[in-house]
Amino acid sequence: MEAREPGRPTPTYHLVPNTSQSQVEEDVSSPPQRSSETMQLKKEISLLNGVSLVVGNMIGSGIFVSPKGVLVHTASYGMSLIVWAIGGLFSVVGALCYAELGTTITKSGASYAYILEAFGGFIAFIRLWVSLLVVEPTGQAIIAITFANYIIQPSFPSCDPPYLACRLLAAACICLLTFVNCAYVKWGTRVQDTFTYAKVVALIAIIVMGLVKLCQGHSEHFQDAFEGSSWDMGNLSLALYSALFSYSGWDTLNFVTEEIKNPERNLPLAIGISMPIVTLIYILTNVAYYTVLNISDVLSSDAVAVTFADQTFGMFSWTIPIAVALSCFGGLNASIFASSRLFFVGSREGHLPDLLSMIHIERFTPIPALLFNCTMALIYLIVEDVFQLINYFSFSYWFFVGLSVVGQLYLRWKEPKRPRPLKLSVFFPIVFCICSVFLVIVPLFTDTINSLIGIGIALSGVPFYFMGVYLPESRRPLFIRNVLAAITRGTQQLCFCVLTELDVAEEKKDERKTD
């Protein structure tokens, strides 16, 4: 890992084919050919692809499986729906703040890139470290396991599916989607589009069925909707936390900003389209659940959508477990697509080994970063209680998201003349920062042990930053340098990859912004 000096060009490697003398003479006599393409990730994500990425990553298995996380802390349907609406509104505010950040700092990497721009390399590295070590691989392992469970469970109706079979199918799912994203960016976006449509159609079917029941007069569950509501601030805080976890993923498109066509237009537009869609779907889906199921049914169900389907879909109830699996598959694809770009950008900034910022010379996909992401997720499949690990990063997740928006306010003050294609009222980032402080403090009191473990995981990156980034390369252990050089060379040959070139136009634009 090498920290590059500001202004120093990124080293580039070019594959030069062997040519015979006759070939050279033939080339001289032939018409001049177009110069080779610049070795960079290509802008292949359209507005529709962007909407699919955001919606597909936000709508995971949670809305199908465990909306009871909000209900258990609110104790009433009325208060539960209010919390879902507040969670959606808060997520919309955060997404709008990220839309401004994404059009102002046109780099991939989401909060990592924004923290790097505002506060420098150390805090950005810690943010990258937490994602690399826990957040991304744990989340992907859990999604893959959930997918495998819903695929295998119908074959074992009276017992739990075999542990090893679930883990092997989860591993196959991760490897398949990694291959798809290594092959072509378009393959990844087409998979995303298809599975996003599938999960939205499944949720619309649930919503329509619920509204039909409601129109038929089944409104008894809403007659005293707020009866028994919990007004305890601690419980309401935990309910909001559960809702916000289901809304997570609204920053997906910010991880791939550099690959979006016309990002200054399409990034905020995709966010503006996606957020109302997801918020409306979540609220209406819960209304459908609450129309058919009473509170005890919801709280006792391991998969609320499946229980709902058993009571309403009749012979077609089998479609909902399939829909949950498809939703997980699409969500996993979006996560792999986004997190690989995070590692790619981290490598390009000198915070990870150079080999992770290589791309295939013909397909223009970050194959080493994708393979690294795949390896980390597969390692976490070995951990038997991988679901426990998700409790460690709720504190750090909201800390870094909030810090990104603090950076937005800081850059407003530090660089007031910097061009901002989208400039929000300062009211939005201030409100989001205040709410983020609340979301950071709550786990420290309600889940102290797990929060402290999360802080410890973040701080474990400090010695790695010192050894791999802060320390000059000449002072790092020779053995480590030789090993990294050998791995980099082998990866380049095996994956047919080279380091990306600096985008001169983008660099000049960034210089004009900071002048």
UniProtKB/Swiss-Prot annotation:
Q: Which residues lie on this side of the membrane: Extracellular?
A: 66-78, 136-167, 216-235, 288-311, 385, 447-451
Instruction: Give the UniProt keywords, A-Z.
Output: Amino-acid transport, Antiport, Cell membrane, Disulfide bond, Membrane, Phosphoprotein, Transmembrane, Transmembrane helix, Transport
Q: Which reactions is this enzyme annotated as catalysing?
A: L-lysine(out) + L-arginine(in) = L-lysine(in) + L-arginine(out); L-leucine(out) + L-arginine(in) + Na(+)(out) = L-leucine(in) + L-arginine(out) + Na(+)(in); L-glutamine(out) + L-arginine(in) + Na(+)(out) = L-glutamine(in) + L-arginine(out) + Na(+)(in); L-histidine(out) + L-arginine(in) + Na(+)(out) = L-histidine(in) + L-arginine(out) + Na(+)(in)
Write down which residues bear the modification named Phosphoserine: 30
Residue intervals on the Cytoplasmic side: 1-44, 100-114, 189-194, 257-266, 333-363, 407-425, 473-515
Query: How does the record classify its membrane topology?
Result: Multi-pass membrane protein
The UniProt family comment states: Belongs to the amino acid-polyamine-organocation (APC) superfamily. L-type amino acid transporter (LAT) (TC 2.A.3.8) family.
Q: What is this protein called?
A: Y+L amino acid transporter 2
Q: Which organism is it from?
A: Homo sapiens
